[in-house]
Amino acid sequence: MFHSLWRLGMQWKGMVIYMIRGVRFKIPQKMDNIIFNILCCLNVESYYWFKISSQTEVWGEQIEEDFFEKEFYKGDEFINIIKNKHRIIFLKIQAYLKECDLKNIHTYEEFVDSNCDIIILVYDCEFVEIYSKNESTSILFFRRAKALGYKSCGYITDDNDSRTKMAVI
């Protein structure tokens, strides 16, 4: 039974089993290609990316330039954009493995029941939370954040997740 729980994304800790929901860490507040740096451990091209406009303020190198011009990107388009330098004020972006109906996901429960595989939330210019349905993807993001020297790296679990809404503002 333990093995099947682990395969479903469970982490054994003493007598309690915690589900790893994602990772959290702090990024530097500077103009850089931070989204690319975080996501390069993932096959970005295999996802469809949906930016939630009302929850996103990201600037390109020209201050008056909105970094993301569209709400929806195929993986190859998305990776070409995120390679450019940008400054994140706040961001909510959702990743899907297949093209489907896209909608703004408001709660963790909606995320679990949706076709969305990853939600990236950045707020206050430096705090990042990435939710993933796949534990191994969360581990990749955690290792990547540590390798980049990002601060306050940790896993988001059922036990420590205080977020009630998937929102950054």
Predicted regions and their residues:
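Structural alpha-beta junctions
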Residues: K13-M15, C41-Y47, K146-Y155
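Short, surface-exposed beta-edge/turn micro-motifs
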Residues: E45-Y47, N115-I118, C125-V128
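Surface-exposed, low-hydrophobicity interaction/linker segments
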Residues: S53-I120
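N-terminal interaction modules that seed assembly of large macromolecular complexes
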Residues: M19-D76
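Acidic, proline/glycine-rich low-complexity IDRs
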Residues: V122-I169
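Short, surface-exposed beta-strand/loop "edge" segments at domain boundaries and coil↔beta transitions
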Residues: D32-I35, E57-G60, L102, E129, ...
